[in-house]
From Swiss-Prot:
NAD(+) binds at G11, A12, A13, G14, Q15, I16, G17, N107, Q114, V131, G132, N133. It comes from the Bacteria. The keyword NAD applies. This is Malate dehydrogenase. It catalyses: (S)-malate + NAD(+) = oxaloacetate + NADH + H(+). The gene is mdh. It comes from Stenotrophomonas maltophilia (strain R551-3). Transmembrane segments: none annotated. Belongs to the LDH/MDH superfamily. MDH type 2 family. Substrate binds at R94, R100, N133, R164. GO terms for biological process: malate metabolic process; tricarboxylic acid cycle. Keywords: NAD, Oxidoreductase, Tricarboxylic acid cycle. Its EC number is 1.1.1.37. Catalyzes the reversible oxidation of malate to oxaloacetate.
Amino acid sequence: MKAPVRVAVTGAAGQIGYALLFRIASGEMLGKDQPVILQLLELPVDKAQAALKGVMMELEDCAFPLLAGMVGTDDAEVAFKDADIALLVGARPRGPGMERKDLLLENAKIFTAQGAALNKVASRDVKVLVVGNPANTNAYIAMKSAPDLKPENFTAMLRLDHNRALSQLSAKLGKPVGGMEKLVVWGNHSPTMYPDYRFATADGASIADAINDQEWNANTFIPTVGKRGAAIIEARGSSSAASAANAAIDHVRDWVLGSNGKWVTMGVPSDGSYGIPEGVIFGFAVTTENGKYTLVKDLPVDDFSQKYIDKTLAELEEERSGVAHLLG
């Protein structure tokens, strides 16, 4: 049996956490031969800690052969101690009447503290995925608060947007998602992200050629993917939790185990490619191998795409400037 991997999860008793933990413990994220130790963080309030205890009881009752241990805590330094993987799910949700800038600042406090705790106690090779919104900027804040860790190990989740885009293309073409490759979602995990199927194929054939309808792309496809989260809240009465958890598992599984040459979308610190300023955490197409990701370089960007990329970058720059004073 392999040595256990320590997986820290914040917001562990929340909706996404509840949809996530059982799948991690069953081996869906890291493989059916990889034991895990779950290190679970929740807020230091009685209700959250009680809920966390209940989730841990359920995890025990599943008798997962791969679950080698569990810790439940309200202390980030306990949760992140020697963590190999950290899933930062917990974030302050936007309350009624709350301005976006207030939400940014509230989350900046959380992710500054969590970045500092990771910097202090996590494995030096910890892989960090930020799920809690605004995910790209929260990941940027955590990265900047952890100067001793590798910047490239801080990532934001755009896989949900990627998967949503795949499902829309599947419905349009009447083809299964399994045969689709080379989709990319550029930018911020927000309604400004740009799902781009110019290079994508279905069973080896060009999706752009098959659809051949730029009006559908601009007026139906892009807005549908961008507003899908809001549509789910409207239909379900609460936000997309199971699909977000699924995307987190996809993101980490591909990062750790490799994408076998397939493109996947990850929010990663820019190296200056595609005119995105260095360090901005931005959705790019990547391939993954041996626990590392590599940007897909030199893709042509047409005028239509550039307009969308500029728009999502402008939003990220605005978010970044809104928290700059907190990062020194």
